Each structure stands twice: as structure tokens, then as C-alpha cells.
Amino acid sequence: MQDKLRFGVFGGGSWGTAIVKMLTENGDRVGWYMRSDSAIRHIIKEGHNPNYLSSVEFEVEQLHLSPDINEIVEASDVLIFAIPSAFLEGELQKLTASLKDKIIFSAIKGIVPESGLIVGEHFHEKYRF
């Protein structure tokens, strides 16, 4: 692992947007996974999320935006999940990249519908992290 940790944030809602803003305010370059190609294009062109916290502006050169969850996992040391619990399993099913040696944080509230578990327990039981 290199000296400066590389962060990846997963989720393009208001919570994910706020987390990305905090990380970029600290001077970090941040990988940001969002499902919406149109939101990604808008952020690149206009410097803000069109759907959530639209008054929050980003220095686009600090962002590595992608609709490919695996691309952001592979480019990051620290993974911060901010995907709503109702959609979490659907997004995690797209994962093929290794999570080995990754630092993983959940910023997700609620219960995962597929398992009935809180997110931390779901991660541990299904993915062993």
C-alpha cells in the first residue's frame, strides 16, 4: 500500500455527496461510484451533483467518477459505502474485484432487505469482512 490512502465512495445520494465533499476538502482525490451516467456527466461539466446537495461544488480534477463499481474498488484502498440499504445487495452483486486488503466502512443506515440484518452484520456474514 502507498503512503497516502486512496478513497472510494459508493453512492451518489446526499450522504455519499457529503462524504465526497468532506474528503475532497481534505485535499484527497476521491473515486466516486454512481449508477447514473447522466449525473456523472453533469458533475464533470457543472461541478455539482444535480440531484442531491446541488449547492455543494466540487473541484472536478479531484474526482474519479465511474458507473463501474469494480473500477472504483480497484482504484481505492479505503471503501466507504453510502448506498441505501434497500439497494445495497443489488450493487454488491456487481462486484468482481477483490476486496482483499481493503479498508471498508459502512455509512449505511437500516436493514438489508434480503437478509434482514443490519449492514455491518450483512457484510460480515455474506462477504466475510
Where do the PLM segments sit?
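A conserved beta-strand/loop capping segment in the N-terminal third of enzymes
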Residues: 53-94
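Charged/polar, solvent-exposed surface patches and flexible loops
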Residues: 41-45, 71-74, 90, 121, ...
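NAD(P)+-binding Rossmann beta1-loop-alpha1 motif at the extreme N-terminus of oxidoreductases
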Residues: 1-52, 56, 63-67, 73
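Rossmann-like NAD(P)(H) cofactor-binding subdomain of soluble oxidoreductases
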Residues: 78-129
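Conserved short-loop catalytic and cofactor-binding motifs
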Residues: 31, 60, 107, 111
